[in-house]
Regions:
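Flexible, charged surface loops at secondary-structure boundaries
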Residues: 1, 33-42, 71-75, 130-135, ...
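N-terminal pre-catalytic "stem/leader" segment of glycosyltransferase-like enzymes
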Residues: 1-51, 146-147, 156, 170, ...
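Charged active-site motifs of nucleotide-sugar-dependent glycosyltransferases
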Residues: 3, 135-139, 173
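Catalytic donor nucleotide-activated moiety binding site of glycosyltransferases and closely related
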Residues: 6-10, 160-200
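Well-ordered, non-membrane alpha-helical segments in soluble/globular domains
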Residues: 16-23, 56-68, 154-165
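Short, well-ordered secondary-structure micro-motifs within conserved domains or adaptor modules
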Residues: 33-66, 71-72, 77-79
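Generic beta-sheet signal
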Residues: 45, 81-83, 177
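A nucleotide-sugar donor-handling region in carbohydrate enzymes
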Residues: 76, 81-153
């Protein structure tokens, strides 16, 4: 069985080092190829995105071109390292990663976490608080408009429907906070629909 680590699936040196360490730990081969090479198990780091075909764009995003080539041509198992969902810091370097089989998203990947013991979660020191049903406001937090986690959902439409539902079911103030990459896009949606002074 040939396990092949595609080191150029990420342009970041610290992530390439992670892949090298993983390769050493399982005695896998590492390739520096910029295109797919046949193997039984392909290992990549990061999500893949469809990219615009301009030459300049392709050069900047060659790691996405490689990952698309792997996803399109590989017929065996695909192991995907991706940024963590839990205990994530605002940094490019992480203490842990999620690892999915054949994909990186819930519902599409097998994370082999069914019936997992709580020791890994508990080791992160996350304090899970009870759902708060009282307070002065409800906070609605936006996501990057083009993030894969949205599965194609129109975030602006989701926001409008969520605000309408909240206005019908609570008297609390509704505060919308956008994702930093969106600048003030969701705020513009809120302002465009001229909601009551309960929404900001």
């Amino acid at each position: 069985m040939k396990n092949l680590i595609f080191i150029n699936s990420t342009p970041k040196p610290h992530e390439q080092e992670l892949l090298n360490q993983f390769a050493d730990s399982i005695s896998a081969d590492v390739t520096h190829s910029k295109q797919y090479e046949p193997c039984d198990v392909a290992v990549i780091l990061g999500s893949w995105k469809k990219i615009i075909k301009s030459r300049e764009h392709l050069e900047k995003l060659s790691h996405h071109k490689l990952k698309n080539d792997i996803v399109d041509n590989h017929r065996g198992k695909l192991m995907v390292f991706e940024t963590p969902l839990l205990n994530r810091k605002i940094t490019q370097e992480h203490d842990s990663y999620r690892v999915g089989l054949n994909h990186y998203m819930r519902g599409l990947s097998d994370f082999k976490n069914e019936n997992s013991l709580p020791n890994r979660f508990n080791s992160m020191g996350i304090d899970v608080k009870d759902w708060r049903s009282k307070g002065d406001h409800i906070l609605v937090i936006g996501q990057n408009l083009y993030d894969a986690s949205l599965f194609g959902i129109d975030l602006e439409l989701w926001l409008i429907n969520t605000i309408k539902m909240l206005l019908k079911n609570t008297d609390r103030k509704i505060i919308v906070r956008d994702h930093p990459e969106n600048k003030s896009r969701l705020k513009e949606v809120v302002n465009k629909f001229n909601y009551t002074n309960r929404v900001s």
